[in-house]
Amino acid sequence: MSHRKFEHPRHGSLGFLPRKRANRHRGKVKAFPKDDQTKPCKFTAFMGYKAGMTHIVREVEKPGSKLHKKETCEAVTIIETPAMVVVGVVAYVKTPRGLRSLNTVWAQHLSEEVRRRFYKNWAKSKKKAFTGYAKQYDSEDGKKGIQAQLEKMKKYATVIRVLAHTQIRKMKGLKQKKAHMMEIQINGGTIAQKVDFAYSFFEKQIPIEAVFQKDEMIDIIGVTKGKGYEGVVTRWGVTRLPRKTHRGLRKVACIGAWHPARVSYTVARAGQNGYHHRTELNKKIYRLGKVGTEAHTAMTEYDRTEKDVTPMGGFPHYGIVKDDYLMIKGCCVGPKKRVVTLRQSLLTQTSRLALEEIKLKFIDTASIFGHGRFQTSLEKMRFYNRVTK
């Protein structure tokens, strides 16, 4: 017990127990921002797919600091965010035991990619999901019934959320055909305004700029990379035993006293590591890339080189970013292609870091696979004198 005469802080946090595999592949939003009925109706969450990481150079805006007006290099993550499609609205009522679902209204036409979500094996199924429900829109009685459900929401509901799904067919780097679906809470306005707002978006697309803005702080919810079965040193960070230890040294030497005659849950043990559900707070949006605009490229006010945000050769294990995207500071949970849930911050941001306006000077687009030194293929061809005249 060398160097432990006075204290020995435990290794590993107990705040994330149990360390087991997540129940679902998609990040679950367990809380939405607080509602303010004085503001206009707005969506509070979105979903995207992690493409990869690169780095940027920007100028620091921090008056009074030695870094003010100096350049800094920071890592950023690119999350591809194609527009989501609204296919339903669900109402909740507050009860003494929490929120209870009141009723749900679905749109008339649901695409194949979202109907796949309701089957385990689409190929062997009869593919009849929602065919009976859609017939309600064909008759006058059915339309009246749907309007009655909406009026019931306006009368009794306290929380309104829309059912929206991703357009996974636009993700050329993914082989999956089954869309991811989630509930997105609507904040702002009265309950009647929220229901009308949700119904007006039926079978329509929600772009990413309708939910988030540049320089906004957001939360990212997702499932981390899976590592499988790991030992105590990797899983909990406990100290390796001395070299001459009998029967292994990457272990916990003593797992407890004789009595109580059981192993405490606080003792580090081997087991599942990774594929855990995690929420990361306060990720700043550095850029909103819209398809067909200069914002989708890697051009900045200082670097006018015509280049796309996708690095040379594409993002490893992902490919090319062809749709809208978010550029956030730092890393985020999960491997490439993992679906991540983006949520508006639950807190009122007042820090200087959160309110700082970001001005990008340079976005790196060199090949990530290997030691990239060229920003564009044209630059590489010129270096090797391969440019045709």
UniProtKB/Swiss-Prot annotation:
Record's subcellular location: Cytoplasm
Keyword Ribonucleoprotein, does the record have it? yes
Q: What is its main location?
A: cytoplasm
Q: Which GO terms describe its cellular component?
A: cytosolic large ribosomal subunit; cytosolic ribosome; nucleolus; nucleus; plant-type cell wall; plant-type vacuole; plasmodesma; vacuole
Q: Where is the composition biased (Basic residues)?
A: 18-31
Q: Name one Pfam family in it.
A: Ribosomal_L3
Q: What UniProt keywords apply to this chain's record, in alphabetical order?
A: Cytoplasm, Ribonucleoprotein, Ribosomal protein
Region listing for Disordered, in residue ranges? 1-34
Question: Which InterPro entries does the entry mention?
Answer: L3_arc_euk, Ribosomal_L3_dom_3_arc_sf, Ribosomal_uL3, Ribosomal_uL3_CS, Transl_B-barrel_sf
Gene Ontology biological-process annotations: translation
Q: GO molecular function, one example?
A: structural constituent of ribosome
Q: Does the keyword Ribonucleoprotein apply?
A: yes
Q: Which Gene3D superfamilies match?
A: 3.30.1430.10, Ribosomal protein L3, domain 3 (4.10.960.10), Translation factors (2.40.30.10)
UniProt similarity note: Belongs to the universal ribosomal protein uL3 family.
**Protein name, as recorded:** Large ribosomal subunit protein uL3z
